[in-house]
């Protein structure tokens, strides 16, 4: 750690744990050392994806950080043979390791690296396969000739620290010159094969070809076996059947530029503006309960869109310190109010229903015709529990436990259908990526689908694309007049491209995603009512 300049902030003795049983038995924990490291990210927008870019006009290079021979001791390969091994790889030259790391960082900064993946458990062959798994098509043609050593097994399975990087042909000479000048060893190892779904590997006279989809099935099997112990109602099997059949699809409005300027927004607004108490400024209040945890992302999304944002705790409403009379929009954020002890949002709803001042403030707010409201995740559950979306329905909607009976957290696809929502109507026809994180997100909708103002649907009817089993694949609904919206996914956590698990590569320079438009629409509507 001293040699490479890494501080050790703390330590935990995990090698002496024992478990005592009433009958006197004592189990000593196996010797285990876990080392976790973290590093500064100076620009979250300048990151490299581990997913291979399917472009034949690119090259893959292997950079070994270890300056050591390939060794199989302690590797996943050795363990798969029931062995451990004593000949393990190490970092022989700490300064060389630092030089390699710094060189890769500089190439990322210069925009030369299209994709990259570390070499760790499973070795080089696992790295190459994992770079292809997330793609629906395409493969790799690999030649190990330039990697030092005579043992192809060691080349493929040794876990010496290193990386594989993908470089466009237009930058390959710059990359080679840069690495050579900095005395960094590298080996060209292959190119993508966009038309063939295989990993082809050659090393001299030795050749092998692997079916990527078959390898992915093997790679995924352990996850399936664990999932089977956690998920109910056969959802683990559903996930195993569907995880390769539900690709993320993106479709934006034709006039979407991805710039803040398109919406008249300024990311540096906070540097130049001061709080404005003028009555003509749109004001939004974020209402929180004990356990709410999504208020900061929501506050920033609203503020960026032009709102002045107010933080309101339930105690403010219960005591009468806050009446919502000067607020144009209220937002109920995600989280786990009251730790979900009474069920999702049940306790939060009770705080409104059984505290006269809080109930009066809410009733008066919803009685006005110049207001908007938004509920996300736990806030969506609250709005449905309080029957704020469709009070005219004879049969009430409910949010129930996910069909899998477990907490679901994933990045998936939504389609925005035609709707009259203030926030979402302009996004009709879009297909967008978004995060979900909930345990009780299944919409039970007892009325016919056309009785609901549906503002968002999961792209796929089957699990896991529909993560909770919601009726009609519904992810969000709105009041009949379009003013009050409740949805389970977190649009406030997806307003920037760097927040999304996947965003179209050709749009990587976008400043914002289409989700920001929903907040801008809300602000414009409020302004029209002032």
Question: PLM ranges: what are they?
Answer:
Residues 42-43, 67-70, 172, 291-294, ...:
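Short, acidic Gly/Pro/Ser/Thr-rich loop/turn segments
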Residues 7, 13-157, 169-283, 291:
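Intein/HINT protein-splicing elements and their conserved insertion hotspots or analogous self-processing inserts
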Residues 164-168:
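Short hydrophobic/aromatic beta-strand micro-patches
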Residues 203-376, 380-391, 401-408, 471, ...:
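N-terminal beta1-alpha1 cap of cysteine-dependent amidohydrolase-like domains
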Residues 321-322, 363-364, 398-530:
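Amide-donor transfer/coupling interface in amidating biosynthetic enzymes
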Residues 25-29, 51-55, 106-109, 155-159, ...:
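Solvent-exposed alpha-helices and their adjacent loops that cap or buttress functional pockets
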């Amino acid at each position: 750690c001293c040699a490479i300049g890494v501080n050790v902030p703390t330590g935990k003795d995990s090698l002496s744990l024992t478990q005592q049983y009433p009958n006197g038995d004592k189990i000593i924990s196996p010797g285990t050392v876990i080392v976790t490291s973290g590093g500064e990210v100076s620009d979250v927008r300048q990151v490299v994806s581990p997913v291979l870019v399917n472009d034949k006009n690119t090259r893959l290079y292997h950079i070994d950080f270890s300056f050591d021979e390939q060794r199989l001791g302690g590797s996943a390969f050795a363990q798969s043979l029931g062995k451990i091994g004593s000949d393990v790889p190490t970092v022989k030259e700490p300064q060389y390791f630092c030089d390699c790391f710094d060189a890769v960082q500089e190439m990322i900064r210069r925009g030369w690296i299209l994709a990259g993946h570390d070499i760790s458990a499973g070795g080089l062959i696992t790295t190459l396969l994992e770079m292809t798994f997330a793609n629906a098509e395409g493969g790799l043609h690999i030649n190990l000739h330039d990697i030092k050593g005579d043992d192809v097994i060691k080349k493929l399975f040794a876990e010496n620290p290193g990386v594989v990087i993908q470089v466009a042909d237009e930058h390959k000479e710059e990359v080679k010159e840069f690495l050579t000048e900095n005395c960094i060893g590298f080996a060209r190892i292959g190119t993508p094969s966009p038309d063939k779904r295989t990993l082809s590997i050659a090393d001299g006279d030795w050749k092998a070809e692997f079916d990527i989809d078959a390898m992915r099935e093997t790679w995924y099997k352990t996850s399936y076996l664990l999932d089977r112990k956690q998920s109910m109602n056969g959802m683990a099997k559903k996930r195993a059947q569907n995880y390769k059949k539900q690709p993320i699809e993106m479709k934006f409005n034709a006039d979407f530029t991805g710039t803040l300027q398109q919406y008249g927004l300024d990311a540096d607004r906070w540097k130049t503006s001061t709080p404005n108490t003028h009555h003509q400024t749109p004001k939004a209040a974020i209402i929180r309960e004990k356990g709410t945890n999504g208020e900061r992302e929501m506050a920033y999304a609203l503020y960026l869109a032009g709102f002045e944002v107010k933080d309101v705790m339930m105690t403010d409403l219960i005591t009468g310190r806050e009446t919502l009379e000067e607020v144009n929009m209220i937002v109920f954020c995600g989280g786990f109010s009251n730790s979900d002890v009474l069920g999702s949002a049940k306790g939060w709803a009770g705080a409104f229903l059984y505290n006269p001042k809080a109930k009066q403030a809410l009733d008066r707010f919803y009685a006005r015709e110049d207001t908007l409201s938004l509920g996300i995740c736990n806030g969506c559950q609250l709005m449905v529990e309080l029957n704020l979306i469709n009070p005219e329905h004879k049969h009430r909607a409910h949010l129930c436990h996910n069909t899998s009976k477990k907490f679901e957290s994933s990045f998936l696809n939504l389609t925005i259908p035609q709707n009259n929502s203030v926030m979402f109507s302009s996004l009709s026809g879009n297909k967008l990526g978004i995060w979900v994180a909930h345990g009780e997100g299944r919409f039970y909708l007892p009325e016919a689908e056309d009785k609901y103002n549906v503002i968002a649907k999961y792209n796929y009817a089957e699990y896991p694309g529909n993560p909770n089993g919601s009726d009609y694949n519904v992810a969000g609904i709105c009041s009949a007049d379009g003013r009050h919206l409740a949805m389970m996914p977190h649009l406030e956590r997806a307003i920037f491209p760097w927040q999304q698990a996947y965003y179209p590569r050709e749009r990587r320079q976008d400043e914002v995603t289409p989700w920001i438009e929903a907040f801008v629409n809300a602000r414009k509507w409020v302004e029209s009512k002032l």
